[in-house]
Amino acid sequence: MGSLLALLALLLLWGAVAEGPAKKVLTLEGDLVLGGLFPVHQKGGPAEDCGPVNEHRGIQRLEAMLFALDRINRDPHLLPGVRLGAHILDSCSKDTHALEQALDFVRASLSRGADGSRHICPDGSYATHGDAPTAITGVIGGSYSDVSIQVANLLRLFQIPQISYASTSAKLSDKSRYDYFARTVPPDFFQAKAMAEILRFFNWTYVSTVASEGDYGETGIEAFELEARARNICVATSEKVGRAMSRAAFEGVVRALLQKPSARVAVLFTRSEDARELLAASQRLNASFTWVASDGWGALESVVAGSEGAAEGAITIELASYPISDFASYFQSLDPWNNSRNPWFREFWEQRFRCSFRQRDCAAHSLRAVPFEQESKIMFVVNAVYAMAHALHNMHRALCPNTTRLCDAMRPVNGRRLYKDFVLNVKFDAPFRPADTHNEVRFDRFGDGIGRYNIFTYLRAGSGRYRYQKVGYWAEGLTLDTSLIPWASPSAGPLPASRCSEPCLQNEVKSVQPGEVCCWLCIPCQPYEYRLDEFTCADCGLGYWPNASLTGCFELPQEYIRWGDAWAVGPVTIACLGALATLFVLGVFVRHNATPVVKASGRELCYILLGGVFLCYCMTFIFIAKPSTAVCTLRRLGLGTAFSVCYSALLTKTNRIARIFGGAREGAQRPRFISPASQVAICLALISGQLLIVVAWLVVEAPGTGKETAPERREVVTLRCNHRDASMLGSLAYNVLLIALCTLYAFKTRKCPENFNEAKFIGFTMYTTCIIWLAFLPIFYVTSSDYRVQTTTMCVSVSLSGSVVLGCLFAPKLHIILFQPQKNVVSHRAPTSRFGSAAARASSSLGQGSGSQFVPTVCNGREVVDSTTSSL
């Protein structure tokens, strides 16, 4: 039913056309007739269909079809015995006019059924036409995509194959709608892909687009935008140019492009006349863009004529083709007198040479006398005609194998079989190709030609003239020689930019607004982050740092104090001097072990005390050493133990003095546990308390090493022992108790007689120690963020603690031993008056309360020496 309605509509339309004015038609007789549809004229104004003669896309392409038919008809190997004719019409570059003209192609089919059979009248006779319309075997054309789409919709109803030489709309690849259409050119999505790759090559990510109204421009720009999105290229604004736009309207389009100053590149998918008007408007407005144009512009001089300045620097695309020298010779030999078969040639001649046949001033002109520019798609016109001829040749061989004439099987030609079995399967070497090129004509399963494009730039040559320069090609991939592009050569400076946002620095990522992949803010990564991708900063993690390129992370070297560091030299020097001094004191005491000063000092406790002081100095080396499990164990064990050895010995000393004189004042018996063995036992018991604490600490918190990074200095990884500062100071709490008790006893015995002024020196030692510790603790906590300062503070504090003991307690004794040896002898004196009364009172009280009497005596005016105090 739908086909009948369409047929009725066509009949009515045909009748209306038949009643109109006579039209020009180029007709060549032949056994098989091919239709031709060419834009002989440009578009007319609003009140007329046709405008001026279109020299390149109209006359040249039409003559290319005639040239190809002449060669085929003379070829003894291609359709021998069969002559091809032609029925060529003018589309006037307009789809509606082309559809009216194309009704000529189906007139003969109207007298046949859809299967090719002729209509039978009620009386049994075949229907006939009064003017005997020519049966069209196939159609070559049209040129513009919107023309081909309209004509293809008509021809498919009558199963007439169609091969276009220039229509590139992607819509025409849809075989469900255009099932009798083929073309020798590729579809626009290949061209769109090539244009998108050019933009990506130059890093143009923010562009404007202009498309012609109609299928060519609209479907082409849609395909481009699809390819652009796949490459993260954004469209700033999309404009359209219409068929009947005024100069002011084109200027409005240019102003709209100027509203997006960041988009310096404009992509054109326009017909040649639209591109010409757009360039002219840009020239008038003094607007400058970098144009990237489709094959609608191509390499046509007519597009840029008069607007060369506005077009300079443009990149244009054109289907890869080669000029046919035989056609050039053929075309230049034509004139109105030897080419009367072309009804439009006289009109072309008058327009080309600005002459008039009425005035008879056209005979003096010749095409050989003027520059000739072969239109870029001449090759595709010739290939289209040859493709139809090869398909008919193969069909003739299959259906008429025994004759060179047409047989009944091809009267009429079955268009469906011709297209499906022969046109789509045709394959041959392109005619008239240069000897050094290989160009095969064939169609894919969609009826499309194979895609290859030449890429040009429009530049100003050294002579000041403008010209097109081929700079590359696209054949499933882009190849460009940028040295041929003036603004892209290495000596030209930075490339023209067309982007919404500037590229982010190496240490920055993009913060993109939703839906805007080309416009972003640059957000710097943190120093400890690397770029996971262009949108994300990722944390390297503690102990790691981003590499120079910010593509990944590397493990930071572990920092600890080396022996050669300035932070180590000072503490180690102090420790070495202190250790040597301690060994020297020990040596002096051992050498003078039996002298009164050494004996009166309490030799056993002095040696223990010297051992503790030596341990204090040794702790510096343990704290400076590279942390390891063994070193960390020694740090925990050694620090508290060194202090406990010192302060346990001092506490034992001060406690003994306090008990002795406390008992003397009260007249008590001799105090218990004041013998050397008892004193050593008490001291060791006090030391063992610290050892128990340390062992418990080691069990609860196993020693080891760990990496430590301060939040504010993550680029520094410190190798440290795994204990907490609080744990370390907690382990010293026992020593704080010893110091407090020792200081208390030293304070209580501060008023002892001068013979017992060792208590005074112990007091000095403890007071100084308290000051050191009160200064050390806050410094230790405050400097916890800098392991070097903290370690140095610890080492110096421990060494100072040992030095105070060494200086306050042992220096006076050493002075007597070395420089006042006369005082280091045993002599007996009477009690001094200051001590006598106290001794008497102590003696009196002791006599009343105990069986034995404890009476201290004075030796050398300094120390108490008797059977019970000889070891002080």
UniProtKB/Swiss-Prot annotation:
Q: Which residues lie on this side of the membrane: Extracellular?
A: 19-567, 626-636, 701-725, 784-793
- Gene Ontology BP annotations: behavioral response to nicotine; cellular response to stress; chemical synaptic transmission; G protein-coupled glutamate receptor signaling pathway; gene expression; glutamate secretion; intracellular glutamate homeostasis; long-term synaptic depression
Q: Which GO terms describe its molecular function?
A: calcium channel regulator activity; G protein-coupled receptor activity; glutamate receptor activity; group II metabotropic glutamate receptor activity; scaffold protein binding
Q: Where does L-glutamate bind?
A: 57, 61, 145, 166, 168, 295, 377
Q: Where are the transmembrane segments?
A: 568-590, 605-625, 637-655, 680-700, 726-747, 761-783, 794-819
Q: Which UniProt keywords apply?
A: Cell membrane, Cell projection, Disulfide bond, G-protein coupled receptor, Glycoprotein, Membrane, Receptor, Signal, Synapse, Transducer, Transmembrane, Transmembrane helix
Tissue specificity comment: Detected in brain cortex (at protein level). Widely expressed in different regions of the adult brain as well as in fetal brain.
Any idea where this protein resides? Cell membrane; Synapse; Cell projection, Dendrite
Q: Where does the record say carbohydrate is attached?
A: 203, 286, 338, 402, 547
Q: Report the record's disulfide bonds.
A: 50-92, 234-518, 355-362, 400-407, 500-519, 504-522, 525-537, 540-553, 632-721
Gene this protein is translated from: GRM2
Q: How does it assemble?
A: Forms heterodimers with GRM3 or GRM4. Interacts with TAMALIN. Interacts with HTR2A.
- The name of this protein is Metabotropic glutamate receptor 2
Role this protein plays: Dimeric G protein-coupled receptor which is activated by the excitatory neurotransmitter L-glutamate. Plays critical roles in modulating synaptic transmission and neuronal excitability. Upon activation by glutamate, inhibits presynaptic calcium channels, reducing further glutamate release and dampening excitatory signaling. Mechanistically, ligand binding causes a conformation change that triggers signaling via guanine nucleotide-binding proteins (G proteins) and modulates the activity of down-stream effectors, such as adenylate cyclase.
Where are the Cytoplasmic topological domains? Answer: 591-604, 656-679, 748-760, 820-872
Renumbered to this chain, the signal peptide range is 1-18
Annotated stretches, region: Important for interaction with HTR2A: 677-685
The cross-references to PANTHER family, in alphabetical order and at most eight, read: METABOTROPIC GLUTAMATE RECEPTOR
CDD domains xrefs = PBP1_mGluR_groupII (cd06375)
Q: Organism's domain of life?
A: Eukaryota
Sequence similarity = Belongs to the G-protein coupled receptor 3 family.
Question: What cellular component GO annotations does this protein have?
Answer: astrocyte projection; axon; dendrite; glutamatergic synapse; plasma membrane; postsynaptic membrane; presynaptic membrane
Q: Topologically, how does it sit relative to the membrane?
A: Multi-pass membrane protein
Q: Name one Pfam family in it.
A: 7tm_3
